[in-house]
Amino acid sequence: MEYTPTIGLEIHAELNTKTKMFCACKNDTDEKRPNVNICPICLGHPGILPVINKEAVKHVLKVGLSIGGKIGYFTEFDRKNYFYPDIPKGYQISQYKHPLIFGGELLGVKITRVHLEEDTARSAHLSSEASAKLDENYSLVD
């Protein structure tokens, strides 16, 4: 049996939008004060529904067209369940089965898909403390 090596890369790019991916909170990853730009959507409170950032969708569509990708006629978001400290709500909103863009190529490198997803919180591990601190300013940013 012969094997063919296959190399896959997952590249994350932070979109330059005024608000976060699924809420109206300010998208400011340079904010020095923790947990300033957060809301019940960022924290996953019960009964609160996310609303997609139209500006982010426009950016992804431009990227897709620039790489020769195809725009999906249908898209959907999934909740990927994670049990990590930097996702206190227990899930991440992401696209997988039905991304906005599929296919394309950049500098000879084939691209499978371009999709949107929220980022996790940023965790800080201080050497002087036994616990970690979370900054939700970064959640919902990608």
Describe each region flagged by the PLM.
Residues 1-142:
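Basic, nucleic-acid-interacting segments
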